[in-house]
């Protein structure tokens, strides 16, 4: 189920169980995982498959492996706050994913996270190809970190 309010989302979470975050794109998606205490977000991996059934199967495997209690999906909204084609694509994916999983899903504004992740990796001297292979997972960790920080204030 998609939860639009962070406070309501946090009330549905199981204690000592991690969250995952997804930075969903048309060519790949980044995955991040929190620790069980939900105090730290870490990049986990990047899925380069674009077939939605395979993507969902991969995500369900991650959810099961790490005993995840909730999902955060980055919502790409343009700088003015308007809905874009990418926003609609992510919303459609989120709605499809809810049919396969019985966990709360929270949609988090992800403006500029991929760019910030790319700049972060660049600051370590990472080459463009390597940055492109890792920026979505780092962006997912930034999205998740935003949610974790916000949940501390609830």
Curated annotation (Swiss-Prot):
KW Cytoplasm (keyword) present: yes
Species per Swiss-Prot/TrEMBL record: Rickettsia akari (strain Hartford)
UniProt-listed SMART domains: YqgFc (SM00732)
Family, per entry: Belongs to the YqgF nuclease family.
Record keywords: Cytoplasm, Hydrolase, Nuclease, Ribosome biogenesis
Compartments it resides in: Cytoplasm
GO cellular component entries: cytosol
Protein name as it appears in the record: Putative pre-16S rRNA nuclease
Molecular function GO labels: nuclease activity
Predominant cellular place of this UniProt entry's protein: cytoplasm
